Amino acid sequence: MGARFRQSADGYFLRTDSQLATRGAPRDALVADLAPPEVRGAAFGLLQSLDTVGSFLGPLLAMRLMLLWANDFRTVFWGAVIPAVLAVALLFFGVREPERHQDGKRINPIRRENLRRLSSAYWWVVGIGATFTLARFSEAFLVLRVQATGLPLAFVPLVLIVMNVVYAAAAYPFGKMADSRSHKSLLAWGLLLLILADVALAWDGHWGVVWVGIVLWGLHMAMTQGLLAAMIADTAPADLRGTAYGFFNLASGLALLIASGLAGLLWDSLGAAFTFIAGAIISSVALALLLLRRSA
């Protein structure tokens, strides 16, 4: 039963990541184009908050409809078409992109001369974002960690609900804070939260400490994800933002793949506690590099 849950959890995150791969870059580029620079952090924080609310309200609604319609998958999936159609209608009729003045025909933006226009500050954000992801493997391991404490299988989904509620509640306030505070300082605090979360999740004592780790994990996500998106917008040329977000998502996706693969190997060979300790070590190295860059 636990194995089946692990497979379903892994499948959930694979599907989620594939959705982000197709919509993440154009969505973030559109927000960066429409949001005034002085409130860009708040805009991305609100985006992360609403996106997270949808990610856990959708499955809860699907569960309710499955019970209401006697496990009729076909009807439930047809019901899911409704919000998708509403989203497309809102995109086409309610969102106006800023005007772009282009001379001649469109060309492929992924060209050597365009990549040279992406500054070292941009590539630093890409690197630090990939390092964050390398230290923060798939949330499926949070589910497995709580399950190992003896929580009944029926209540295991509470892990993602709690983490996402914290994430959604804190993303906008942290995003708004990013508009008036040092981005590097907030990144450092976000890494510190991740280190504390890893230490709590590695704890073999009371199960309550593990739940503290879940909350800290959600706070880390809220503090860093919208902030990194805003930093990409600040460091990339306006006409290359889609490309910039695409490379950022590519680097983060590869880092997540590597991190989750290594975490799985560590989990199977050395146990859950060592897996999260390894995450804390990687986070500590990233924090040290960030602080060294701040002092340079």
Predicted regions and their residues:
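Helix-to-loop junctions at the C-terminal end of transmembrane segments
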Residues: 66, 170-182, 267
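Structural signature of the two symmetry-related core transmembrane helices
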Residues: 81, 185-200, 280
